[in-house]
Amino acid sequence: MPVYFQRPENALKRANEFLEVGKKQPALDVLYDVIKSKKHRTWQKIHEPIMLKYLELCVDLRKSHLAKEGLYQYKNICQQVNIKSLEDVVRAYLKLAEERTESAKESSQQMVLDIEDLDNIQTPESVLLSAVSGEDTQDRTDRLLLTPWVKFLWESYRQCLDLLRNNSKVERLYHDIAQQAFKFCLLYTRKAEFRKLCDNLRMHLSQIQRHHNQSTAINLNNPESQSMHLETRLVQLDSAISMELWQEAFKAVEDIHGLFALSKKPPKPQLMANYYNKVSTVFWKSGNALFHASTLHRLYHLSREMRKNLSPEEMQRMSTRVLLATLSIPITPERTDIARLLDMDGIIVEKQRRLATLLGLQSPPNRVGLIKDMVRFNALQHVVPEVKELYNWLEVDFHPLKLCTRVTKVLDWIKEQAEKEPELQQYVPQLQSNTVLRLLQQVAQIYQTIEFSRLSSLLPFVDAFLLERAIVDAARHCNLQVRIDHTSRTLSFGSDLNYSTREDAPVGPFLQNMPSEHIRNQLTAMSTVLSKAVATIKPAHVLQEKEEQHQIAISAYQKNSRKEHQRILTRRQTIEERKERLENLNIQREKEEHEQREAELQKVRKAEEERLRQEAKEREKERILQEHEQIKKKTVRERLEQIKKTEFGAKAFKDIDIENLEELDPDFIMAKQVEQLEKEKRELQDRLKNQEKKIDYFERAKRLEEIPLLKKAYDEQRISDMELWEQQEEERISTLLVEREKAVEHKNRMSRMLEDRDSFVSNLKASRQSVYDAKLKQFQERLAEEKRVRLEERKRQRKEERRISYYRDKEEEEQRLIEEQLKQEREDREKIENEKREAEQREYQERLKKLEEQERKKRLRELEIEEREKKRDEERRGPDDSFRKQDTPSRWGDREESGWRRGADPDERKQAPPERDWRSGGQDSKPVKDEDREGDEDSVLRKDEEQVARGDGDEERAASWRGTDDRGPKRSVEEDGGPRRGFNDEPGPRRGFEDDQGPRRGLDEDRGPRRGLDEDRGPRRGLDEDRGPRRGLDEDRGPRRGLDEDRGPRRGLDEDRGPRRGLDEDRGPRRGFDEDRGPRRGFDEDRGPRRDFDEDRGPRRGFDEDRGPRRGFDEDRGPRRGFDEDRGPRRGFDDDRGPRRGFDDDRGPRRGFEDDRGPRRGFEDDRGPRRGFEDDRGPRRGFDEDRTPRRGFEDDRGPRRGMDEERVSWRGGAEEDRGPRRGAEEDRGPRRGAEEDRGPRRGAEEDRGPRRGAEEDRGQTPWKPVVTSRPASGGWREREKAREDSWGPSHDSKPPEERDWSKRGEDGEKDSERDRRPVREESAWRRGGDDNVTPRKVSPGDKSTEDRKEPSDVRRAAPKTDEPSQWRQGEQKDSQQEERGTPRRVAAADREKPSWRTEKKEEKDAPRRPKLEEDEDGWTTVRR
């Protein structure tokens, strides 16, 4: 290896220089160094000429080992990049070696080498022979010229095959080289090399089978690979047959059969025909006539089945050959008895089985079976006539005297066809031997003794010696009973009367048995003779019966023959179909396996390609870096050389050696170059300036000289143009004149034909008029017929349309009658329900009157006690204290003296925080105002009456009350963003027992007289109330407003809420002007109920959701719950919502009686039907409403919640934040998880009352609070405390002012807790109300229809920041818009901002903390 590295281009140049001076070895060394170098492992275009030159030198110098190393290195270089280059190089190498060998052979007179093995040219025998014998010049020349080149060529073939083995990319080249190697062996008669070549190919094939997982491995299942291997093996078989190497030929046959076994598809017929042809030759050469004939049989059948274009001549030739080969099979068995006994290990049997396997046979063939097959497949009819009778003479006819004469004619004809049919000549000796044996067998059956000369005369083509040999072989092998008497020259047959050693049936023509056979079969013959005798003497009736049975059998066969034939044909067809199906399944399986293997190989190939691509990329990157370095150095060198060529550079770089580039400073070189460039640039600028000045002066002088010349040329051009125009104009005029003269001449000539033209046209029209008239008449008839047909069709269609319209109208009328009937039934049911509700209400009012009377008496006694205590206190304190007391509000005083009870002192209400009920959930955004009440004087009395009503434990009244409302737990206004519903789904919060909207007023408060049943109650006002006159029952102005309200006028019945709807309307509840809830849903809509403004539950579930559609009366899911179902007691007196309102209740009229908000939804209500029996939106929320699951006796959701429960959200705690409580049988889908953001959870510190647990009584009796049997004695504090102890967390008995401020603190804490919770994104359906929003319904059970409208307005106008998800708000809003007749006014706080809808939109962008503000009445409003 040289000490320095050379580039490939330089190495090739260097090698060429060595070759020019005749130094091949140094040139080879230079190229060898480049090829072995590890720095150029990436293939380049220069590698191919280097490799060709390298191999050329190897061939010239006969360096086969160097050629081998170079080829292996080149294979590694270009295998993944350019495999075609490797193929070209290998082919060029072998071609070059063959050419040199051919030239050496031409120079030598020795055509065939005497050397047996080229690998061992100098054997000990050859050395001794050369030493003792003389060697002439020619022999020495042959040995020096031809032998080395033949050896080199053989080594080249072997090395190339080793190089290319088991590589799918060069598989074609591998097989081409193998076939060339076989030709080489055949050309130079190299038997030893042929054997080695066959062994190498066999080893390569086994390696392919072992290393099939390599990336470039050959897939033997590939049809192309199999065909190439078979082609190579057939060439090997041909070469072995040509070289008469029968052992190698037999091995080649086994290799071919092994390749057939590897292939799952059958080989091509042409290939099999060639295979059988070659195998038959091998069998015949090996002396195995039996398998030779069997192979020809297979070839004959294959040709008949597969070859479509088989000519009669070819069929005749093949049939003749098959016949002769079959008859040439020796009659003598291959093995004698002794050989059969000596074959202990079954070697011969195994050999026969292997040979049969090579032909695809299940068992070894025999001579008799082949003859039968030949006859069965009718091969004799295609045999030539001259040979056709040979079969009958040898195998059928018994004529020993003429046998040899006949056979001799056939054999003579075969010998005459030596030129046309050379393959038939080989059968003549075997046919003669078989003829001799047949003659001996037939003679033995006729003669007992015959002379030897007589027998020789019968066999003219056999001499005496061969005849005697044939007789001895027949006696030994064929069990022929013959004895030769040499003294008398005779032959004796059948003289041995012993038992026969074999019981083989006679083969060939048969006349009679031998004497030994008679003796051996005497008993059998006797039995046969007796049977014949019995048959002869059998009576006639037995024969007749037998004949009749025979006829019956024949008739039965004739009857069933067609059916049986059809069954056999069907069975054959079934077998064929099954074969085809199995073949298709095998093909499909093979295809799938092939695809799977291809996929796996593709994966492996892709992985290998990716790896090689990465390696090639890295090598390419390294090569590019090296090239860049070289280019850089080359550029620097060239630049220095250029600089040194200049005058200045030669001086500047005179002492610098260009070869020492690494020692030079790049900055120094660059500075020198820049300096030189600047100098040259300045010189160039000077030259350019001088040139510019020179060109400028020259151009100016030229233009001054050319001005007069241009003027002169212009004048000349103008004159010539004028002359040309005049000439062209004259020519045009003359041409026009000539054309006009010709036109006039044509006109005159054609005018003479005008009369003839007119006469011809008139005659033509006259002749065609009749045809026109006939066609016109025919058209008119067709037109009339078509009109008639179309009119009839139109008439028929109209009749059909009228009939269809009649039936359709009839069906619609029937449907309308059915609907009217259903509507009437629904109205009747509603009427019955209304009457029942009215009866219950009257009963309730009567009971309420009694309770009020009892409460009034109790209150009078309490007031008397208080007055006495007050007097005692005044007497003790004296006149100063009594004077001070006049300014101090009394705890038991009337409303004017207590801001806590008082209706509204604006100053005091601004100062004092509003007292919050512990059941209101701490919702500061929904304060209660006195302005919505008819006077706070009634609240005290009402609360006391409610307490008495709750305390009397009347379960019957509770059941009647709760039966009218089965909506689930009662909710306060703060809970679900809307008023609760009562009997008639009327909105309005109802005051519970412990409603903290102010203490209930006593009888002595200056509220004005209590209203009776029929009063059209204006507001009961205190002395200092400045709210304006209270509205009566008939006023339709909406809720009253105080003097300090600036909310705008209340809307009355006729305000623009849209027309009210009747019973048959299906529009859904009315909506306000700015409502964005979408259109109201009708009866047939299946969208699910609407959702409220601030719901964040996601869309309400529709009818197709998994909790099932809302049920109506006509649904087949079971009856809807009715009045008397066990869904839990209806809410009554002991319900925690407070007593129902009566007629004389002073909290505002109940809806439906004298309510000025429009009549209750009933029969004459034109606001759309209530959600009733057939309403598919789900039943309405009323006393029969089941939009939430009705609470049954077994409902485990805990006690129902009313207005007197204090809760931050409608749902509280871990179990109450999941949406509506569900009954045991509900199928509305999964409950909402605790993590859903539907309001604050119910904390341990919340004082809403006890949570319901599993241990609470959920039996058949309605749940009711624990109340003592008698009312609490003492003042209202004691009663309040008793109620708090029974209903919820106890309140400390502080004065009202202190409790207000403590509640304000609690509110602040809860507000801060709400602020810490994430602000929900307010969607359009959760926004609050504004000026045009229709007010919610107020249930009559809440008794605050007109008294508390403004608090509800304020609550709706200012919802909380984190409003709990209210799953029933949307429904309540819909129902209250249906049933509320009076539009609600907007709160005063709402006029200060456009609407809280817009604030909701703004809160999406910037959520803000709620701010509490108090108005002049002392009510707190949440501003955000």
Swiss-Prot record:
Which UniProt keyword terms apply here? Cytoplasm, Initiation factor, Protein biosynthesis, Repeat, RNA-binding
Q: Tell me where on the tree of life, at the top rank, the source sits.
A: Eukaryota
Q: Example GO molecular function term? A: mRNA binding
**UniProt record, GO biological process:** formation of cytoplasmic translation initiation complex; translation reinitiation
Pfam families in UniProt: eIF3a_PCI_TPR-like, PCI
- UniProt sequence repeat ranges: 994-1003, 1004-1013, 1014-1023, 1024-1033, 1034-1043, 1044-1053, 1054-1063, 1064-1073, 1074-1083, 1084-1093, 1094-1103, 1104-1113, 1114-1123, 1124-1132, 1134-1143, 1144-1153, 1154-1163, 1164-1173, 1174-1183, 1184-1193, 1194-1203, 1204-1213, 1215-1224, 1225-1234, 1235-1244, 1245-1254
Q: Which cysteines are joined by disulfide bonds?
A: none
List cellular component terms (GO): eukaryotic 43S preinitiation complex; eukaryotic 48S preinitiation complex; eukaryotic translation initiation factor 3 complex; eukaryotic translation initiation factor 3 complex, eIF3e; eukaryotic translation initiation factor 3 complex, eIF3m; multi-eIF complex
Q: Its principal location?
A: cytoplasm
Q: Which residues form the PCI domain?
A: 315-498
Q: Which residue intervals make up region (26 X 10 AA approximate tandem repeats of [DE]-[DE]-[DE]-R-[GTV]-[PS]-R-R-G-[AFGLM])? A: 994-1254
Does the record's keyword annotation contain Repeat?
yes
Location(s) in or outside the cell: Cytoplasm
Gene3D superfamilies found in the cross-reference section: 1.25.40.860, UVR domain (4.10.860.10)
Compositional bias of type Basic and acidic residues: which residue ranges?
A: 868-919, 939-1259, 1276-1412
**Annotated spans, Disordered:** 821-849, 868-1424
> What family does the database annotate?
Belongs to the eIF-3 subunit A family.
Q: How does it assemble?
A: Component of the eukaryotic translation initiation factor 3 (eIF-3) complex, which is composed of 13 subunits: eif3a, eif3b, eif3c, eif3d, eif3e, eif3f, eif3g, eif3h, eif3i, eif3j, eif3k, eif3l and eif3m.
Role of this protein: RNA-binding component of the eukaryotic translation initiation factor 3 (eIF-3) complex, which is involved in protein synthesis of a specialized repertoire of mRNAs and, together with other initiation factors, stimulates binding of mRNA and methionyl-tRNAi to the 40S ribosome. The eIF-3 complex specifically targets and initiates translation of a subset of mRNAs involved in cell proliferation.
* PANTHER family noted in UniProt: EUKARYOTIC TRANSLATION INITIATION FACTOR 3 SUBUNIT A, EUKARYOTIC TRANSLATION INITIATION FACTOR 3, THETA SUBUNIT
Name of this chain's protein: Eukaryotic translation initiation factor 3 subunit A
Q: Look up and give the organism this protein is from.
A: Xenopus laevis
